[in-house]
UniProtKB/Swiss-Prot annotation:
UniProt function note: Functions as a component of the Arp2/3 complex which is involved in regulation of actin polymerization and together with an activating nucleation-promoting factor (NPF) mediates the formation of branched actin networks. Arp2/3 complex plays a critical role in the control of cell morphogenesis via the modulation of cell polarity development.
Source superkingdom: Eukaryota
Species for this entry: Arabidopsis thaliana
GO biological process: Arp2/3 complex-mediated actin nucleation; regulation of actin filament polymerization
Name of the protein in its database record: Actin-related protein 2/3 complex subunit 5B
PANTHER family associated with the record: ARP2/3 COMPLEX 16 KD SUBUNIT P16-ARC
UniProt-listed InterPro entries: ARPC5, ARPC5_sf
SUPFAM superfamilies named among the record's database cross-references: Arp2/3 complex 16 kDa subunit ARPC5
Primary localisation category: cytoplasm
GO molecular function: actin binding
Gene this chain is encoded by: ARPC5B
Swiss-Prot/TrEMBL keywords: Actin-binding, Cell projection, Cytoplasm, Cytoskeleton
Localization annotation: Cytoplasm, Cytoskeleton; Cell projection
């Protein structure tokens, strides 16, 4: 498979899972201190999009989902994020919408609306057209 070298090998999946667990603990601490935006930034940082291991993707989604669901002030959150976070956040919003869970979909749609206003349609197009870096 051409380009497979860019993806993380399966034996590195345990290393990725350990990093996700560490990140999860940090996010829980931030959420307990009502630092929701910092928790979201931490969740989005180092997301493992270049792995084919679904366990890693699912574990990271759980961490990002926890941070997304804690966001109450969407405008404030978007003001605190830099543009580099927009595309990866959009990917996770679509992952959230695919769950079919009503509270998750509701939160993801609210963030999606504000993020699209801020980042434009290009953010959606980049997210949907990037089939290599999936979450």
């Amino acid at each position: 498979m051409a380009g497979a070298a860019a993806f993380v090998e399966a034996d590195n999946a345990e290393e990725i899972m350990a990093r996700i667990e560490t990140k999860s603990q940090k996010i829980e601490s931030l959420l307990k201190h009502y630092k929701h935006v910092e928790a979201l930034k931490t969740a989005l940082d180092g997301s493992p999009p270049k792995t084919l291991d679904e366990r890693c993707k699912s574990a990271n989604w759980i961490v990002v989902h926890r941070a997304i669901m804690a966001i109450k002030d969407i405008e404030g959150m978007l003001n605190s994020l830099t543009a580099e976070y927009y595309d990866i956040l959009m990917k996770y919003l679509y992952r959230g919408l695919s769950t079919g869970d009503e509270p998750t979909c509701e939160q993801c749609l609210m963030i999606h609306e504000k993020l699209t206003e801020r980042a434009g349609l290009g953010c959606i197009l980049r997210c949907l057209s990037d089939t290599t870096n999936t979450v």
